[in-house]
Amino acid sequence: MREANVYSEIVPHTVTAADIAAKRPAGIILSGGPSSVYEEGAPRLDEGIFELGVPVLGICYGFQVMAVALGGEVAKTGHREYGSTAVRVSAGARGGAGFLLDGQPGDQTVWMSHGDSVAKAPEGFDVLASTDDTPIAAFANDGRKLYGVQWHPEVKHSEHGQAVLENFLHRAAGIPADWNSGNVIADQVAAIRAQVGSGRVLCALSGGVDSAVAAALVHKAIGDQLVCVFVDHGLLRRDEARQVQEDYVSATGVRLITVDAEEQFLAALESVSDPEAKRKIIGREFIRVFERAQADLVAEAASEGDPIRFLVQGTLYPDVVESGGGAGTANIKSHHNVSGLPEDLQFELVEPLCTLFKDEVRAIGRELGLPEVIVGRQPFPGPGLGIRIVGDVTRERLDLLRDADAIVRAELTAAGLDSEIWQCPVVLLADVRSVGVQGDGRTYGHPIVLRPVSSEDAMTADWTRLPYHLLAKISNRITNEVEGVNRVVLDVTSKPPGTIEWE
């Protein structure tokens, strides 16, 4: 939707028609899902949504829910369709008889993922498309502006999927393509000013894109009311602390205070290997450091009559969704931006990016004039290398992982692939010892995992097919140059089922 320059929000299936009406949406899209409409406890929706007079598009499971709700039938046909599937669009549908598939080729490849199928369309609906195993792959009632497709138009594997979405958004729903990063900046600047007023604000700079753009956005809104604090927790990659202090300050001119808290974080993480526990400890210690760091700032602000009450966080939309953002969603894992905060948190949160995806954050950063070295930086988690060590975190393990990570980043840059991949986490399997032969003797070292992934918004991702010669060079350098490592492996898992980070 946002690629079509239309703003959108995600709400749970339990939302009522009245709640939807109160939001005054221009269109509604019902998403796909893994359930069967006939399963006990399968997600349902308030059928009054179809009576609001708002255009609705059902996708995959949403298509089937719509069919059943409006009097159609869904059945287990015995035929399942997963992956690339050939679909045939009717001549009328592609020739201007309706909005949804108008202008599309008669034969095209789409991405399917379903076991059940719509066996009978609701009364008043025209069948628009079919496959060999699915006679009703799309339907429409243009008079009521209700539409559905069995395939997934939102994924790139559906050749003309974006055109389907844009036909629904712009033609059926009549939504103009006028949402862009400039709109977001103006809206957020106004929202920040309304929330903060003349108050003083703290922001943690982690070295990543999210916190950098969040801080720049807040600084644009309130200027010198913002003070940025860079907590060097000792979990950063090589040279990252220096880059934060030099690159960001020179680009924005914001006031930056650096706190060296490495010893505190390492002490708190001692002998802790559980991933969730590490995330929560890191989140907790971040806040504790802030509470101490603010002492001088509070005294300064108090002398000026402006207490510090606000904390900026670079929370993104995927962080909220993955942390279980509503009924019917699963908590995939806690995020440092939305979990692990102590109950006695003394700040009111300012989260200017919490409705945005990573690619949108980068666009806003460029619009704000941040240098490419900052906005083009590969994503790096707030808990840093602490969650890229599978096992407990020690100074020695951090140094080992930094060396391996530096080699990977240098080789990707030299190969000109920085813009081709989303990110490449380098993971140390610290709790695993692998037997090897180096020199004339047997060794027991730790494996290093390479996790190159391609994505646009971090909600889904696929592993990046790096050239074999590059993988060989990276492996040879790591096993020869990083003491304690005798094996390099490649993670070839997509998301889903795996998340991008190992922990």
Swiss-Prot record:
Entry binding sites for ATP: S206, G207, G208, V209, D210, S211, A212
Assigned EC number: 6.3.5.2
InterPro entries: Class_I_gatase-like, GATASE, GMP_synth_C, GMP_synth_GATase, GMP_synthase, GMPS_ATP_PPase_dom, NAD/GMP_synthase, Rossmann-like_a/b/a_fold
Annotated Glutamine amidotransferase type-1 domain residues: 1-178
Claim: Ligase is one of the keywords in the record: yes
Keyword Nucleotide-binding included in the entry's annotation: yes
Catalytic reaction annotation: XMP + L-glutamine + ATP + H2O = GMP + L-glutamate + AMP + diphosphate + 2 H(+)
GO cellular component entries: cytosol
Role description: Catalyzes the synthesis of GMP from XMP.
Subunit structure and binding partners: Homodimer.
The protein's name in its UniProt record: GMP synthase [glutamine-hydrolyzing]
Gene: guaA
